[in-house]
Amino acid sequence: MSSESPQDQPQKEQISNNVGVTTNSTSNEETSRSQDDNVKEVNGNDDTKEEEQEEDAELDDLFGDDNDDDDDDDVKKSETEKSDSDSDEDDEGENINHRSRHRESLGLDDDEAEEQAMYTRKFYGEDANNFSDQDETTHTFKEENVELVRHIIPSKANVNETASHNEIFYARIPNFLTIDPIPFDPPSFEAKVNERASNSASREDQLDDRLIDENTVRWRYSRDKDQHVFKESNTQIVQWSDGTYSLKVGEECTDILVNDTSNTFLTVSHDQQELIQCYEGGEIKKTLMFIPTSTNSKIHQKLSKAVIRRNQRQSKGPGTYIVSMDPEVEKKELERKQSQILRDRRRRQLKEKEKQESPDAAFETGFRKQNSPTTYGASRRNEYEEDDFLVDDDEEEEAAFDDEEDDNEEEEEEEDADEENASRLRNLKREGAAMYREEEEEEKDRSETKRRRVAVIEDDEDED
C-alpha cells in the first residue's frame, strides 16, 4: 500500500510524462543522428563515385573509349554518306549541265546529241559520258622516258609526179619470190646460212635454201657521200620506153603484167572502235603479176628443177590409204576371192592330170571317176579344216548346210564342164595328130619324088 497523496499523483504523472518526452526526444535525436550518418555515408559514396568517374574520364582522354570510338565512327559514316550523296547529286547535275552546254555550243538537237554520244562511247569507252572538266584535276598522270625508233620515209625516184605515179598497186607475191621486211644485217644473215647448212644434210635442201635467198627482196639503211641516211634495196622496178615494167632482183629480171581492177581498197582496221580507215584515198585501181621473162632464164630453170625434186620426194614418201568399205564386207569379199582361187587351182590340177593321162578315153574317164570322190572329199575336208569359226545357232547351221549344198552343186556343174572341155581337148589332139601324120606322109612322098628326079638327072649326065 502506498502512502502517497492525490496531489502527489499528478506530479508523478507529469514527471513520468516529462520522462517519456525526454525519452522520445532522445530517441528522435538518435534516429536523426543515424539518418545524418546514413546521409553522410551516401554522400561519401557519391563523392567516391564522382572521383572514380573523373579518373575514368582522365584515362579516356589519354587512351580513348571504345564506345566513344563507335559513336564517332557512326557519326562519320553518316556524314560521309550524306556528303557522297550530295556529291553524286552535284556530279550528276554538273554532268547534265556540261552535256547541255556542249549540245548548245554545237547546236545539236536531241537525236543528233544521242548519235554524238554513241560515237563518243565508241571512241572513249562507256565512261565517256561521266567525264567532265572538273574530273581532269582528280586524274593522276605518270611520266616515263621511252625511246621511239623514228623510221625514215621511203625514197622516191625523181620523176614528174603525175596521177599515174601516185597510184597504189596490188601485187600477189608468187611462190618464187620472197620479201624480208626486216632490215638486212650481214652478220645475222651469215649466221642463219651457217645454221641451215649444218642442219640440212642433203644437197637438195641446200639448193632450195639458196634459191630462196637469191629471190628475196631485201632492204637496208645506207649513207650517201654527204652522210645522209637513206633506204637501199636490192630490188628495182624498171619502166621501159614502151610502157612495160620489169622487176629486177639482183641480176635476174622478171616481167610485170599490169591489169585494171575495181572495188579494191587499202585500209587499216581498228578492232576496238569497229572502224576501217583508208590509207591515202585507199582505192586500188591496178594489180601487178610477176612472171619469168622466158623459159630459158636462170630463175625459170632453177624453179623447174626445184619443182621436179619436190615431186620426186613426194612420190618417194609413204602413201595414204583411205578406208571406204565396211571391214566385215571386205572380209567376206576376201573369203569369196580365196575360195575362187582354190577352185581355179583345182581346175588347173585336173587339166594337168588329163594331159598326163593316156589317150584312151574309157580308161581316162574310169580312172577319173574312181579318183574324183577321194579328191572331192579331201577338198571338202580341207575346207572344214580351214574354217576358223564355230556356229552354235541352228539357223546358222541350216544356212551353212544350204550353202554347202549350193557349193556342191556348183562344183559338180563345174566338174561336168571340165570333163566336157577335157573330152573336146582330147578330140582336138587326136585330130591334130592325124593331120600331122598325113602331112608328114605327104612330105615324105614329096621328098622321095625329088630324090628320084635328082637321081635320074644325075644318071643322064653321066651317060652324056
UniProtKB/Swiss-Prot annotation:
Biological process according to GO: chromatin organization; DNA-templated transcription termination; positive regulation of transcription elongation by RNA polymerase I; positive regulation of transcription elongation by RNA polymerase II; regulation of transcription-coupled nucleotide-excision repair; sno(s)RNA transcription; transcription elongation by RNA polymerase II
Keywords on record: Activator, Nucleus, Phosphoprotein, Transcription, Transcription regulation
Positions of modified residues (Phosphoserine): 105, 132, 188, 358, 372
Superkingdom of origin organism: Eukaryota
Pfam family, one: Leo1
Chain intervals for the UniProt region annotation (Disordered): 1-111, 344-464
GO terms for cellular component: Cdc73/Paf1 complex; nucleus
Localization, UniProt: Nucleus, Nucleoplasm
Acidic residues composition bias: residue spans: 48-73, 384-420
InterPro entries: Leo1 (IPR007149)
UniProt main location, coarse: nucleus
Compositionally biased spans, kind Low complexity: 16-29
GO molecular function list: RNA binding; RNA polymerase II C-terminal domain phosphoserine binding; RNA polymerase II-specific DNA-binding transcription factor binding; transcription coregulator activity
Compositionally skewed regions (Basic and acidic residues) per UniProt: 30-40, 74-85
Compositionally biased intervals (Polar residues): 1-15, 368-377
PANTHER family linked to this entry: LEO1 PROTEIN, RNA POLYMERASE-ASSOCIATED PROTEIN LEO1
Function: The PAF1 complex is a multifunctional complex. Involved in transcription initiation via genetic interactions with TATA-binding proteins. Involved in elongation. It regulates 3'-end formation of snR47 by modulating the recruitment or stable association of NRD1 and NAB3 with RNA polymerase II. Also has a role in transcription-coupled histone modification. Required for activation of RAD6 ubiquitin conjugate and the BRE1 ubiquitin ligase which ubiquitinate 'Lys-126' histone H2B.
Leftover remarks: Present with 1110 molecules/cell in log phase SD medium.
UniProt family annotation: Belongs to the LEO1 family.
Entry protein name: RNA polymerase-associated protein LEO1
Organism whose genome encodes this protein: Saccharomyces cerevisiae (strain ATCC 204508 / S288c) (Baker's yeast)
Gene: LEO1
